[in-house]
């Protein structure tokens, strides 16, 4: 609907230019927002205030001329001036109802992508292997997954890339420790304790540390025995990750793994190509790139280190190889990097070097989708009581146990297997939603009591809201698709719910553009609240007429489909009853 209004305004502006009211050459970004006060319209634009100065007119006077020049459209009943020069638009209620009827009949709930479909790389999760995933890996994994799901739903070809840290010193440590302490495969499956013991030896023994580094050199040189051990450690570690992904209901598989090791053979080519481009400069024995746009507080250029003084490569080298692969081989139009926002400078530099070096051969937009940190209830980094890192599996297990206690208290007569099944959906959903509902760039404090609350913007509230809709259709023994009739909007609660449901496509396109799933969370919470008001004020099964009942059932069906689809795009499972 906003696009329709923008087009109407653009046509009016073109007419005013032709009439000499507006000067030629104006290219304003026409903004249309949802009106806050529905008594003054459904949408509002500040275009008259934006163009008043170049037009040499008062905003309200220009607004009058814009309204007079607006073409007639069946979707808009009228336009009015408000305040200092806002133009408020009232949408045609019947046209709105017809759009919702069409959305209910559509497999994509009437949602379409605002622009052309693209090939989009989503770089997400990317844990360092050789140890278990911890809470610090949660945000990249689930925010990236949510945005990837939305992009796919809108029609993009999404290529997930799990850029795991599967190369480096940690594997030398493990190999050196295994040489000292041969163990069985079963014992090795407890990788966390094995890694902890190896790290302790590495920190305490210089001789052990030297041996570990020597094994890394042998590994990088292709030593068969080292490669075999590395493969074993890597496979065990990836299997741990895969269990977490499946528990989190995240769409990542082994086929999506493209770790640091995958780019090893291209690193020397990256160095040689930068050298050939005249971009490499030696600084303190290291090979670096200096770019004028990146300087320190003293105004000196900051180095992007490509090769260390000891000949080793860094993250920047591998990331440059990855950029070239994603552009040249994958032919991506867009690459989204879901990595901690503390890496912002790193990615700014990598992207700039890649463009200058000509590594982006296929036009590819690169965006660092940085995010804040998850903290404990005290606002400090989330740790165990003894100050250690919290393992992700432990956090998710506790979430399920807490949800189980909550569900059992509310439903003491349910069978235990059903309680466990519901608790898994509620517990995992609560952890994910608590994260996804926060702005991506914000830090937030992890709080089990808040996220498992049945009131407020939480997963349990939304899951329960969906079961209320599902319950209506369960009573009727009908599917959402089996409701005949047409939507007719009479009561204010019907109109408010309908107007919100019509915004689903706009919200999803916003998530796809900005990588901000919290806007989808807010939208679903608002839909649930409006459905609650509608459900209380507009009886469905005891409606006054059969036609009214069918209309309200259709509104409920579209609400159910929207909530279910929205939660699925966030990676949350739904329940038919709680």
UniProtKB/Swiss-Prot annotation:
SMART domains: Arg_tRNA_synt_N (SM01016), DALR_1 (SM00836). GO terms for cellular component: cytoplasm. Pfam families: Arg_tRNA_synt_N (PF03485), DALR_1 (PF05746), tRNA-synt_1d (PF00750). CDD domains: ArgRS_core (cd00671). PROSITE patterns: AA_TRNA_LIGASE_I. The keyword Ligase applies. A motif ('HIGH' region) lies at residues 127-137. GO terms for biological process: arginyl-tRNA aminoacylation. PANTHER family: ARGININE--TRNA LIGASE, CYTOPLASMIC, ARGINYL-TRNA SYNTHETASE. This is Arginine--tRNA ligase. It comes from Pseudomonas fluorescens (strain Pf0-1).
């Amino acid at each position: 609907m906003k696009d329709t209004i923008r087009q109407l305004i653009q046509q009016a502006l073109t007419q005013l230019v032709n009439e000499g009211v507006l000067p030629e050459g104006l290219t304003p970004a026409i903004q249309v927002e949802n009106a806050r006060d529905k008594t003054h319209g459904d949408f509002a634009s500040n275009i008259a205030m934006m163009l008043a100065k170049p037009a040499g007119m008062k905003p309200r006077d220009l607004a009058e001329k814009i309204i007079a020049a607006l073409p007639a459209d069946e979707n808009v009943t009228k336009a009015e001036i408000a305040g200092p020069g806002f133009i408020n638009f009232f949408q045609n209620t019947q046209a709105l109802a017809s759009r919702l009827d069409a959305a209910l009949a559509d497999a994509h709930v009437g949602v379409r992508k605002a622009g052309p479909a693209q090939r989009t790389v989503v770089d997400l999760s990317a844990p360092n292997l050789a140890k278990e995933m911890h809470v610090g890996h949660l945000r990249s994994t689930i925010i990236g997954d949510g945005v990837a799901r939305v992009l796919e739903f809108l029609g993009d070809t999404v290529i997930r890339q799990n850029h795991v840290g599967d190369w480096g010193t940690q594997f030398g440590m493990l190999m050196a420790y295994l040489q000292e302490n041969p163990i069985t495969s079963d014992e090795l499956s407890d990788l966390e304790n094995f890694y902890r013991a190896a790290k302790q030896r590495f920190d305490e023994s210089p001789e052990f540390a030297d041996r570990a580094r020597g094994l890394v050199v042998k590994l990088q040189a292709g030593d068969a025995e080292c490669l075999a051990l590395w493969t074993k450690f890597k496979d065990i570690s990836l299997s741990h990750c895969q269990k977490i992904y499946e528990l989190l209901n995240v769409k990542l598989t082994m086929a999506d793994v493209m770790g640091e090791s995958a780019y090893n053979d291209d690193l020397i080519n990256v160095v040689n190509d930068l050298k050939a481009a005249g971009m490499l400069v030696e600084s303190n024995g290291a090979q670096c790139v200096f770019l004028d746009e990146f300087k320190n507080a003293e105004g000196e250029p900051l180095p992007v280190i490509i090769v260390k003084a000891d000949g080793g490569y860094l993250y920047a080298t591998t990331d440059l190889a990855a950029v070239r692969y994603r552009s040249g081989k994958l032919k991506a139009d867009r690459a989204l990097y879901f990595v901690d926002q503390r890496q912002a400078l790193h990615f700014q530099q990598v992207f700039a070097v890649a463009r200058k070096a000509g590594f982006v051969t296929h036009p590819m937009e690169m965006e660092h989708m940085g995010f804040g940190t998850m903290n404990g209830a005290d606002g400090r980094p989330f740790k165990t009581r003894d100050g250690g890192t919290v393992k992700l599996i432990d956090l998710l297990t506790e979430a399920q146990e807490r949800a189980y206690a909550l569900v059992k208290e509310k439903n003491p007569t349910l069978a235990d297997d059903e309680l466990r099944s519901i608790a898994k959906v509620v517990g995992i959903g609560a952890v994910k939603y608590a994260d996804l509902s926060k702005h991506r760039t914000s830090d937030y404090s992890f709080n089990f009591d808040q996220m498992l609350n049945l009131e407020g913007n939480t997963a349990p509230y939304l899951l329960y809201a969906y079961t209320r809709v599902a319950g209506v259709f369960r009573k009727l023994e009908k599917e959402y698709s089996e409701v005949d009739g047409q939507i007719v909007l009479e009561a204010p609660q019907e109109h408010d719910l309908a107007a919100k449901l019509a915004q689903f496509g706009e919200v999803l396109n916003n998530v796809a553009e900005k990588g901000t799933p919290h806007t989808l969370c807010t939208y679903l919470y608002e839909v649930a609240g409006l459905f609650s008001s509608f459900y209380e004020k507009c009886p469905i099964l005891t409606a006054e007429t059969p036609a009214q009942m069918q209309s309200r059932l259709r509104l409920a069906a579209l609400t159910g489909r929207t909530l279910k689809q929205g939660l699925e795009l966030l990676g949350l499972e739904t329940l038919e009853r709680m």
